[in-house]
C-alpha cells in the first residue's frame, strides 16, 4: 500500500484571462508564465497525496523546514476578477513551498555525492542544463525552467523530491545552532539569502568597502541584503520600511538608519533628500529594491544614487515603473535586474558565511508552525507580523 502524506496544495482552473494569448509552452504544458494571467478560481488547501519516489538522479527529502516567502502569500485568495494574484511562473495544481531544508530519506540509483541522513538544502530553480542559457551558465534564465514549489511539488509537505545537482549539504550548521532541529529551521532561510546574494553581488556587482547603501523593504530578502552588505563593508546602511518590527530587525542585522517612507511622503518630503542628508551629500553606492512596489521607490532611488551607483532590482512586480534614462546616464549609473539564485557558487558561499558566523538568518526567524497551521503561517507573513516564518512538517 502506497504511503500517504499531508501537503498544502495550490490549485486553479486553467482559463486564460480575456484578452490574454497563452504562449506555446503555456498551452502545451498547461502552465503559466504569470499565474495571474491564466489560473482562475484559485484554491489553497491541505490535502493527502502519495509520498513521492525519487527518480534515478533525485533524492527524497524529509522536510525539516519550509520558510514562508512573500510569493506564497499571493496564493491566498484571488483578485477582483477571481484570478490568481501570483504574478509568476507556475503550473497548478502544485504543492507550494520553495524555501526549504531537510534530511535525505532515500536516494536514486545514480546519486553519487549524497547519502541517506545528509542534511541538505536545494535550489528552487530546477534548470535543465541543456538549453542555450544554461550552457552559458545563466541557470536562472533556463528556457525549460521548472521551479520547486511553483511548477513542481514543493516543501509544504512531509516529503519532496529534488535532483541531486540542485542540492547542497548543510550538516555544518548543526555545530552553529546546537541541534539538528534548529539547524534545519534556519537552513530553510538560505534560499532568500541566496536570492539577495544573487541580486547584490552576482548581478549587482557589490560595493566597494566604505560605500553607503539603501535598502527598500525589510522583509526577509531585504534583511538578507542588509546582512550581506554589512559583511561586505558598507558604511551607512539606510533601510526603508513602514513596519516598526521589521525596522527593529533591520537594525539588529546591520542597518545604521531606519525610516518609514510614508511618514516622509505624507509630508511631501523626498526620501532622496533624506538619504543625501544622512550620507552628507555622498549618496548611495547601491540601492537595493526588495519590495513588490518599485513604482514608488525607483524614482527616489535614481535621485539618491551616487555617481556610478547601482540599483539592484530584486523585488518582483507585474506593474510598470517610470524611469528617465537621462538621469541614470548623467550619473553613469547601473540598473541590474535579478531573479532566482542558481549558479555562480551562490549557495555554497551563503552556507559558508552562515557557518563562519558572518551572517545569521536565525536572527529574523520569528516563529515556527506545524504543517496543519501552514495557512496561518502564510497569513502571518501577509500581515508582516515579523521577520520570517517557517513551517516544520515533521515536528
Where are these regions (language model features)?
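C-terminal hydrophobic helical "lid"/dimerization subdomain
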Residues: 1-3, 21-22, 273-274, 288, ...
Amino acid at each position: 500500500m502506497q504511503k500517504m502524506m499531508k501537503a498544502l496544495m495550490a490549485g486553479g482552473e486553467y482559463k486564460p484571462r480575456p484578452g490574454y494569448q497563452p504562449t506555446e509552452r503555456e498551452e502545451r504544458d498547461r502552465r503559466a508564465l504569470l499565474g495571474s494571467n491564466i489560473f482562475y478560481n484559485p484554491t489553497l488547501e491541505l490535502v493527502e497525496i502519495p509520498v513521492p519516489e525519487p527518480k534515478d538522479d533525485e533524492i527524497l527529502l524529509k522536510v525539516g523546514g519550509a520558510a514562508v516567502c512573500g510569493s506564497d502569500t499571493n496564493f491566498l485568495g484571488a483578485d477582483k476578477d477571481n484570478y490568481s494574484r501570483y504574478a509568476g511562473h507556475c503550473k497548478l495544481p502544485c504543492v507550494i513551498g520553495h524555501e526549504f531544508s531537510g534530511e535525505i530519506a532515500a536516494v536514486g540509483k545514480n546519486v553519487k555525492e549524497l547519502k541517506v541522513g545528509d542534511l541538505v538544502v536545494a535550489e528552487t530553480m530546477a534548470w535543465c542544463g541543456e538549453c542555450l542559457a544554461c550552457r552559458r551558465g545563466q541557470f536562472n534564465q533556463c528556457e525549460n525552467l521548472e521551479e520547486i514549489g511553483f511548477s513542481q511539488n514543493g516543501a509544504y509537505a512531509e516529503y519532496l523530491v529534488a535532483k541531486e545537482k540542485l542540492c547542497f549539504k548543510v550538516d555544518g550548521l548543526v555545530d552553529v545552532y546546537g541541534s539538528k532541529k534548529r539547524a534545519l529551521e534556519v537552513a530553510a532561510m538560505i534560499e532568500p539569502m541566496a536570492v539577495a546574494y544573487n541580486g547584490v553581488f552576482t548581478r549587482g556587482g557589490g560595493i566597494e568597502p566604505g560605500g553607503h547603501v539603501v535598502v527598500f523593504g525589510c522583509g526577509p530578502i531585504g534583511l538578507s541584503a542588509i546582512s550581506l552588505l554589512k559583511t561586505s563593508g558598507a558604511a551607512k546602511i539606510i533601510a526603508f520600511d513602514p513596519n516598526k518590527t521589521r525596522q527593529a530587525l533591520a537594525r539588529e542585522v546591520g542597518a545604521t538608519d531606519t525610516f518609514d517612507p510614508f511618514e516622509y511622503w505624507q509630508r511631501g518630503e523626498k526620501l532622496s533628500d533624506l538619504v543625501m542628508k544622512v550620507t552628507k551629500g555622498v549618496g548611495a553606492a547601491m540601492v537595493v529594491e526588495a519590495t513588490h512596489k518599485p513604482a514608488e521607490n525607483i524614482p527616489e532611488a535614481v535621485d539618491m544614487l551616487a555617481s556610478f551607483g547601482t540599483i539592484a532590482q530584486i523585488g518582483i512586480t507585474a506593474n510598470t515603473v517610470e524611469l528617465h534614462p537621462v538621469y541614470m546616464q548623467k550619473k553613469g549609473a547601473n540598473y541590474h535586474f535579478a531573479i532566482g539564485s542558481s549558479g555562480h557558487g551562490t549557495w555554497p558561499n551563503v552556507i559558508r558565511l552562515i557557518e563562519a558566523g558572518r551572517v545569521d538568518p536565525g536572527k529574523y526567524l520569528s516563529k515556527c508552525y506545524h504543517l496543519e497551521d501552514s495557512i496561518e503561517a502564510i497569513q502571518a507573513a501577509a500581515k508582516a507580523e515579523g521577520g520570517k516564518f517557517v513551517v516544520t512538517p515533521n515536528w
